Amino acid sequence: MLKGEKVVLAYSGGLDTSVIIPWLKENYECEIIAVCVDVGQREDLRYIKDKALASGASKVYIEDVKEEFVKDYIFPTLKAGAIYEGKYLLGTSMARPLIAKKLVEIAHKEGAKAIAHGATGKGNDQVRFEVSIRALDPSIKIIAPWRIWELKSREDEIEYAKKKGIPIPVTKEKIYSVDSNLWHVSHEGGDLEDPWNEPKSDIYDIVTPPEKVSDKPEYVYIEFEKGIPVKVNGKTLSPVKLIEELNEIGGRNGVGIVDLVENRLVGMKSRGVYETPAGTLLYIAHRELEYLVLDKETMRFKELVAQKYADLVYNGLWFSPLKTALDAFIDETQKNVTGVVRLKLYKGNVINAGAKSPYSLYNEEFATFGKDEVYNQKDAEGFINLFGLSLKIRALMEMGRKDMDEAVGR
């Protein structure tokens, strides 16, 4: 048991973690150290601190890690081009290992024997938190109330919170599980659990629905250095400010809405509606620049790496040796990913409107259909003969077998 011991709680102030503080105190008789990791969630963190203390926490940490989140988690994933199942830009997945890292650091600082989290027993986050914590310190005990308590639904949690006098910002009539950070906002649960239901227009927090945006297109210029975005519209910005600026630009143009039924790590499908305006712009711009500067074989292999990288991040394996090794490969591919991309934004659409790089492998003189000295069109005949040789041999062999069959009357 943990009677009298310290337990570090990953605290968000939302429904799940709001009821965990009194529950832990009732069932473990322990001291609660609430830790809110600021990854850019759009909430009043002063209110969260007061709420945690009022709920029974003895101490509250609010850790601002936005800069670290962008530089050490978002940008490496962007450079990898990692997208889960073709749509999901991994907003929640990237934040969880960083949160776990801070929980472990504070547990060490406070001498806590255990870490608790509010992830459900059906979701991916329980895996991400616990695998990350164990990768960093396997001696720390982990408490996952959702897997052991008597509360079986969000409605049960609401009733428990009311009984304990804990204010919560949801009702039984409109229950969405919302996760937000600097990179994205995700919406799950409620009427979204039926994939036939279209998301209500008022669900969106940072993206204006495309049908409500201006009829005029807007252009945005994004500049990269070695795969890292550094400027927007010619202005150098810090990593955090750059994401915020692109969220504003993309959001007002209806960019970045994704509705996805995804395959969870734990084996079931779930539906999520995501808002990722800055991420959408950055992924498209980064890819357009790679088209210019990467050779064919590197680009094709990097596509395979991107898929594996996305799976590792989604599955909570951020601190795995393989992910570290893939980072080394990706960094090598990004040495020449420097240049400017111009994007045209119109009612939720993002259209490439130009790209340039000092390391571009595209040469207009080589690519032209006119006369040139580098490419001799007569050379194409020999290339075609060799390239298609295996098919030619196959056809000749089949013709020979057919003639033989006819000769023997088969």
From Swiss-Prot:
Keyword ATP-binding: yes
One BP term from GO: urea cycle
GO molecular function annotations of the record: argininosuccinate synthase activity; ATP binding
Lineage: superkingdom: Bacteria
Residue sites binding L-citrulline per the record: 88, 93, 124, 128, 177, 186, 262, 274
Protein residues bound to ATP: 10-18, 118
Known catalytic reactions: L-citrulline + L-aspartate + ATP = 2-(N(omega)-L-arginino)succinate + AMP + diphosphate + H(+)
Alphabetized InterPro entries for the sequence: Arginosuc_syn_C (IPR048268), Arginosuc_syn_N (IPR048267), Arginosuc_synth (IPR001518), Arginosuc_synth_CS (IPR018223), Arginosuc_synth_type_1_subfam (IPR023434), AS_cat/multimer_dom_body (IPR024074), Rossmann-like_a/b/a_fold (IPR014729)
UniProt keywords, alphabetically: Amino-acid biosynthesis, Arginine biosynthesis, ATP-binding, Cytoplasm, Ligase, Nucleotide-binding
GO cellular component: cytoplasm
Binding site for L-aspartate: 120, 124-125
Compartments (UniProt record): Cytoplasm
EC number from the UniProt entry: 6.3.4.5
Functional pathway: Amino-acid biosynthesis; L-arginine biosynthesis; L-arginine from L-ornithine and carbamoyl phosphate: step 2/3
Nucleotide-binding keyword on record: yes
Family: Belongs to the argininosuccinate synthase family. Type 1 subfamily.
Known partners and oligomeric status: Homotetramer.
Alphabetical list of PANTHER family matching this protein: ARGININOSUCCINATE SYNTHASE
Protein name: Argininosuccinate synthase
Organism from which the protein derives: Caldanaerobacter subterraneus subsp. tengcongensis (strain DSM 15242 / JCM 11007 / NBRC 100824 / MB4) (Thermoanaerobacter tengcongensis)
Lineage: Bacteria, Bacillati, Bacillota, Clostridia, Thermoanaerobacterales
